[in-house]
Amino acid sequence: MSYDTRLREARKRAGLTQEELGKLVGCAKTTITGYETGKSEPNMAILSKIMEALKVDANFIFQDEMREHYEYH
C-alpha cells in the first residue's frame, strides 16, 4: 500500500473529510486530494501536521516505501 493510500485510510479512520483535514493542517481540500491521489507530495512541515492530526507516525505512512528501499539495497 502506497503512502497516498495510507494517508486516505488514516483520514477515513479518523472520521475526517478531506476538507476537515485540510482545515486542521492549513491546506485546501484540493491539496489533500492531491496528496491522497499521489499527484503531489506534502512537504515535511505539512506531513508532520497531517500525522499529528491523524494520530499516525511516519512508520505507518511510509512502511511499504521503506521496505522496498531496504529490499533493493
What do the PLM-derived regions correspond to, one by one?
Residues M1, K12-R13, E41:
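Short amphipathic helical patch at the helix-1/turn junction of helix-turn-helix
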Residues T5-L24, K49:
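Short basic helix-loop element that most often maps to the first helix and adjoining turn
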Residues L7, L21-G22, I32-Y35, I61:
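Conserved hydrophobic/aromatic packing and binding residues within compact polymer-binding modules
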Residues G26-E41:
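Recognition helix of helix-turn-helix/homeodomain-like DNA-binding domains
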Residues E36, I46, F62-E65:
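DNA major-groove recognition helix of helix-turn-helix
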Residues N43-F60:
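DNA major-groove recognition helix of helix-turn-helix/homeodomain DNA-binding modules
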Residues F60-H73:
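Short, charged recognition helix plus adjacent turn
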